[in-house]
């Protein structure tokens, strides 16, 4: 597959795996939003109109290679087909409600999805530019150190609302090309929500990201991050091949049960076994998974816990990202000191693990890892205010 740069030239039970039901809002119009369709679906739609498959490919190229949303601008499409498309279809990406820019070049967009908002973050670096994309409005998993989790869960995003974040960002970044802004080269499903609880929408969206007539990204440049929804992870391996990152954050079940509550349903051993099964099928990961580990002061950052983590991961090929915790209002944690992070990292490297301390980006605009919140109407009725008033959070110190 050729790789094109992106430019404009609840509890777990509250958010099911979406095997049979996709939680969405109703479309704003009766027209088909072509951003909801991957290439196979697009060709089927065009066939229903009596058109040949290559016409669908042509339209996709205009949509994703050039970020056009007006059929009249698609000059190699005949006028009759353009008129037909105007009657029955549209290209409607979610709009930007607010944009914030960090001193380090990071850009955060609040994206309107119905009457709510999710957040999308553009992170430029010397050799790449990564877009962090949301998959749900809120999140049901209640990870205690994450701002999104404190908003509760409302619904899954549609395909058009997921790929639409990439489309909108690519269009904006393309317009900034003259300023030297780096085109998007990587997409990570690490924004608001648990992607594996929205497989029916996340998988087609990632398919479009990697399609030659879509955004044309390599499978190694599209990453899905999960906290450990094991049945859905097994299903993912049969549906698509992308890079995998896992939100581990603790070396033992007693700590992970507290800070990542889904661990009470799928413990570390069960989770890592599923990860190894995925790696056995995947070519996108180069044989190893990325382990994400947020550093919480005196919670999970002792040298003893570093040894425990090394033991925990000894049978799982991986590289480890140590993430400085990013604070949000009302959170009961502190960021690990540089000295504790350094000691933790050195222990892991002594065991032979590739270990990276992630540089915090966009924290001045609350765009850093764990800080995304958006605007969520909480269908699970779990808000930070209620938690702090009626459900004290148990914390172990080490």
UniProtKB/Swiss-Prot annotation:
GO terms for molecular function: 4 iron, 4 sulfur cluster binding; metal ion binding; rRNA (adenine(2503)-C2-)-methyltransferase activity; rRNA binding; tRNA (adenine(37)-C2)-methyltransferase activity; tRNA binding. Keywords: 4Fe-4S, Cytoplasm, Disulfide bond, Iron, Iron-sulfur, Metal-binding, Methyltransferase, rRNA processing, S-adenosyl-L-methionine, Transferase, tRNA processing. The active site is at 119 (proton acceptor), 369 (s-methylcysteine intermediate). InterPro entries: Aldolase_TIM, Methyltransferase_A, RlmN_N, RNA_MTrfase_RlmN, rRNA_lsu_MTrfase_RlmN/Cfr, rSAM. One of its GO terms (cellular component) is cytoplasm. It catalyses: adenosine(2503) in 23S rRNA + 2 reduced [2Fe-2S]-[ferredoxin] + 2 S-adenosyl-L-methionine = 2-methyladenosine(2503) in 23S rRNA + 5'-deoxyadenosine + L-methionine + 2 oxidized [2Fe-2S]-[ferredoxin] + S-adenosyl-L-homocysteine; adenosine(37) in tRNA + 2 reduced [2Fe-2S]-[ferredoxin] + 2 S-adenosyl-L-methionine = 2-methyladenosine(37) in tRNA + 5'-deoxyadenosine + L-methionine + 2 oxidized [2Fe-2S]-[ferredoxin] + S-adenosyl-L-homocysteine. It is found in: Cytoplasm. Its cofactor is [4Fe-4S] cluster. Binds 1 [4Fe-4S] cluster. The cluster is coordinated with 3 cysteines and an exchangeable S-adenosyl-L-methionine. [4Fe-4S] cluster binds at residues 139, 143, 146. Its main location: cytoplasm. It comes from the Bacteria. Disulfide bonds join 132-369. Specifically methylates position 2 of adenine 2503 in 23S rRNA and position 2 of adenine 37 in tRNAs. m2A2503 modification seems to play a crucial role in the proofreading step occurring at the peptidyl transferase center and thus would serve to optimize ribosomal fidelity. Reaction proceeds by a ping-pong mechanism involving intermediate methylation of a conserved cysteine residue. This is Dual-specificity RNA methyltransferase RlmN. It comes from Yersinia pseudotuberculosis serotype O:1b (strain IP 31758). The gene is rlmN.
């Amino acid at each position: 597959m050729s790789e094109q740069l992106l430019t404009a030239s609840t509890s777990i039970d509250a958010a099911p795996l979406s095997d049979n039901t996709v939680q969405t809002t109703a479309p704003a119009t009766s027209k088909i939003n072509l951003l909801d369709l991957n290439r196979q679906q697009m060709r089927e739609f065009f066939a229903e109109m009596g058109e040949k498959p290559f016409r669908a490919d042509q339209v996709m190229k205009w949509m994703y290679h050039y970020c056009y949303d007006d059929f009249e601008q698609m000059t190699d499409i005949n006028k009759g087909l353009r008129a037909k498309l105007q009657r029955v279809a549209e290209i409607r990406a979610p709009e930007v409600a607010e944009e914030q820019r960090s001193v380090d070049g990071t850009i955060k967009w609040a994206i309107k999805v119905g009457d709510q908002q999710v957040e999308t973050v553009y992170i430029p670096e010397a050799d790449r530019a990564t877009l962090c994309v949301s998959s749900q409005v809120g999140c049901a998993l209640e990870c205690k150190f994450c701002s999104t989790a404190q908003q509760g869960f409302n619904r899954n995003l549609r395909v058009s609302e997921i790929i639409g974040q990439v489309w909108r960002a690519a269009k904006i970044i393309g317009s900034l090309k003259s300023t030297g802004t780096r085109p998007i080269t990587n997409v990570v499903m690490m924004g608001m929500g648990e992607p594996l609880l929205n497989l029916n929408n996340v998988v087609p969206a990632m398919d479009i990201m990697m399609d030659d007539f879509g955004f044309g990204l390599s499978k190694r440049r599209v990453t899905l991050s999960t906290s450990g929804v094991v049945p859905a992870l097994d299903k993912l391996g049969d549906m698509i091949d992308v890079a995998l990152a896992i939100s581990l954050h603790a070396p033992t079940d007693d700590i992970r049960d507290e800070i990542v509550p889904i661990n009470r349903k799928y413990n570390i051993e069960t989770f890592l076994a599923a990860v190894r099964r995925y790696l056995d099928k995947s070519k996108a990961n180069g044989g190893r998974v990325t382990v994400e580990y947020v550093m919480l002061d005196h919670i999970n950052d002792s040298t003893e816990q570093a040894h425990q983590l090394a033991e925990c991961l000894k049978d799982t090929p991986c590289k480890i990202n140590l993430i400085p915790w990013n604070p949000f209002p009302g959170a009961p944690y502190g960021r690990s000191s540089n000295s504790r992070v350094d000691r933790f990292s050195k222990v892991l490297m002594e065991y032979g693990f590739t270990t990276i301390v992630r540089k915090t980006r966009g924290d001045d605009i609350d765009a850093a890892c764990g800080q995304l919140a958006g605007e969520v109407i909480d269908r699970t009725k779990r808000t930070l205010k209620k938690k702090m008033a009626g459900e004290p959070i148990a914390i172990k110190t080490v």
